[in-house]
C-alpha cells in the first residue's frame, strides 16, 4: 500500500512539474507531449523504485559471475576436483547459451559432509546478490517440506505451483532439492514436465532455470571406487567422471527410494550425476584452517597440536587405514569451537565476584 502512494506521488510530480520533466527528457513542446513524457518518466521511475524496494530479475540482483564461481569452488571446496570440473563448466555453458533446449539438471551424490549443500550455496551466491535468501532460489528439504505421506496429492499441487510461480518471476531461478533420495517417487515425477524439452509450460519458459538434486544415495559406491584408488596407490585426482557416472545412474535407478524408476532417469533428464568423494584427513585439515580464519583465529592454523586434536576428535574409515572422514567436514565447526573453548582463558573468580 505504501508503494502505491509513493507511485501516485511520483506520477503527480512527473505530470505537473514540467521543469522536472524537461530536466530529465528535454524541451517540452505541448500538452500532449507533456502527458506522453510524464507517463514515460513515471513508468521508468516506477520500475526503478520497485527494484529498489524489491528483488528484480536483472542486474544487480541477478549477476552470474563465472570467474568468482570458479575461484570460490577452487578455494573454498577441498578434495573435490570432479565437482569443480563438471559444475563450473556445465553452469557456465548453460548460462551463456542463448537458446538452451532444457533446464540444467544436476544430481549431487555423496556421503554427508562432502560439500553438496556447500556447493549449492556457492552457486546461488554467484548467481544472485542475495544468495540463498533470494526469492528466485527455492531450497526444498524433503523431510521438512513434505513430511506427511498421506498428503502426496496435495504436495504435488503445492510443488508445481511453487516452481511455476518462481520461474514466472525469474527464468534464471534455481531449485535445490535437499534429501532428494527421500522424496517420494510421485513428487519427483511431478516436476518432470519442468525439466523436459518443452519451450513453455503454462506460458512459462523453464529452459534457463537450474535444478539441483542433493542425495546421500550412491555414497557407498563413490567411497568404494575412491578407496580402491587410494589402496592402489594412485592419486584421487586421476579419477574421472566416467568412473562414477554410470554407477550412479544405475544405482539411483534401481535403489529403493529416491530416484527409483523415476522418469527423470529413464527419460535422461538429469544432465550430470556429480560424485562428491569422501574426504581424507588432509582435506579435513584444510576445512579446519578455513574455519579458524573465518573465526578470526588464523594464528591457530599453524598450531599443529591444536589442529591434530580437532582431527583426532573425528571418526574415520575403513578401520584398517582410517583414511577417510566418516562425516567429511560437517562436524569440523563444532569440534573446532570445542577445542578453542578449552584453551580460552576463563574469567577469574575476582572478575566474576565484581560482576555480581
UniProtKB/Swiss-Prot annotation:
Which keywords are on file for this protein? Answer: ATP-binding, Endoplasmic reticulum, Glycoprotein, Nucleotide-binding, Signal
Q: Give the GO terms filed under biological process for this record.
A: cellular response to misfolded protein; chaperone cofactor-dependent protein refolding
Q: Does the keyword Endoplasmic reticulum feature in the UniProt annotation?
A: yes
Gene3D superfamilies, per database record: P-loop containing nucleotide triphosphate hydrolases
The UniProt entry, under InterPro entries, shows: ClpA/B (IPR001270), P-loop_NTPase (IPR027417), TOR1A_C (IPR049337), Torsin (IPR010448), Torsin_1/2 (IPR017378)
- The record lists the membrane-crossing segments as none
Primary residence? endoplasmic reticulum
Q: Where does ATP bind?
A: 110-117
One MF term from GO for this chain?
Answer: ATP binding
Q: Does the keyword Membrane belong to this entry? A: no
Domain of life from the UniProt record? Eukaryota
Question: Where found in the cell?
Answer: Endoplasmic reticulum lumen
The cellular component terms of Gene Ontology attached to this UniProt record, alphabetical and capped at eight, are: aster; endoplasmic reticulum; endoplasmic reticulum lumen; perinuclear region of cytoplasm; plasma membrane; spindle; spindle pole
Family membership noted in the UniProt record:
Belongs to the ClpA/ClpB family. Torsin subfamily.
Q: What is this protein called?
A: Torsin-like protein
Please report the organism this UniProt entry assigns to the protein. Answer: Caenorhabditis elegans
Give the classification, highest ranks.
Eukaryota, Metazoa, Ecdysozoa, Nematoda, Chromadorea
Amino acid at each position: 500500500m505504501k508503494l502505491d502512494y509513493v507511485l501516485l506521488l511520483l506520477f503527480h510530480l512527473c505530470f505537473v512539474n514540467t521543469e522536472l520533466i524537461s530536466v530529465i527528457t528535454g524541451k517540452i513542446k505541448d500538452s500532449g507531449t507533456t502527458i506522453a513524457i510524464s507517463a514515460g518518466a513515471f513508468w521508468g521511475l516506477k520500475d526503478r523504485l520497485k527494484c529498489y524496494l524489491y528483488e528484480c530479475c536483472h542486474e544487480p540482483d541477478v549477476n552470474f559471475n563465472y570467474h568468482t564461481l570458479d575461484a570460490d569452488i577452487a578455494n573454498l571446496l577441498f578434495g573435490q576436483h570432479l565437482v569443480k570440473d563438471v559444475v563450473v563448466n556445465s553452469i557456465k555453458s548453460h548460462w551463456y547459451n542463448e537458446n538452451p533446449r532444457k533446464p540444467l539438471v544436476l544430481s549431487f551424490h555423496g556421503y554427508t559432509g562432502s560439500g553438496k549443500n556447500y556447493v549449492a550455496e556457492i552457486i546461488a551466491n554467484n548467481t544472485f546478490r542475495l544468495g540463498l535468501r533470494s526469492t528466485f532460489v527455492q531450497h526444498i528439504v524433503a523431510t521438512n517440506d513434505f513430511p506427511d505421506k498421506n498428503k502426496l496429492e496435495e504436495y504435488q499441487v503445492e510443488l508445481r505451483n511453487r516452481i511455476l510461480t518462481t520461474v514466472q518471476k525469474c527464468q534464471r531461478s534455481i531449485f535445490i532439492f535437499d534429501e532428494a533420495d527421500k522424496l517420494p517417487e510421485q513428487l519427483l515425477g511431478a516436476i518432470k514436465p519442468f525439466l523436459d524439452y518443452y519451450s513453455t509450460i503454462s506460458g512459462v519458459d523453464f529452459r534457463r532455470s537450474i535444478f539441483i538434486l542433493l542425495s546421500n544415495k550412491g555414497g557407498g559406491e563413490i567411497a568404494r571406487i575412491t578407496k580402491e584408488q587410494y589402496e592402489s596407490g594412485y592419486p584421487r585426482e586421476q579419477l574421472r567422471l566416467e568412473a562414477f557416472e554410470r554407477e550412479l545412474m544405475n544405482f539411483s535407478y534401481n535403489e529403493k527410494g529416491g530416484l527409483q524408476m523415476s522418469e527423470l532417469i529413464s527419460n535422461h533428464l538429469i544432465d550430470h550425476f556429480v560424485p562428491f568423494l569422501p574426504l581424507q584427513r588432509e582435506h579435513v585439515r584444510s576445512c579446519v584452517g578455513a574455519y579458524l580464519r573465518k573465526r578470526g583465529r588464523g594464528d591457530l592454523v599453524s598450531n599443529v597440536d591444536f589442529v591434530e586434536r580437532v582431527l583426532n576428535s573425528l571418526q574415520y574409515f575403513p578401520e584398517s587405514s582410517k583414511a577417510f572422514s566418516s562425516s567429511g567436514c560437517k562436524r569440523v565447526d563444532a569440534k573446532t569451537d570445542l577445542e578453542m573453548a578449552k584453551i580460552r582463558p576463563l574469567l577469574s573468580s575476582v572478575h566474576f565476584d565484581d560482576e555480581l
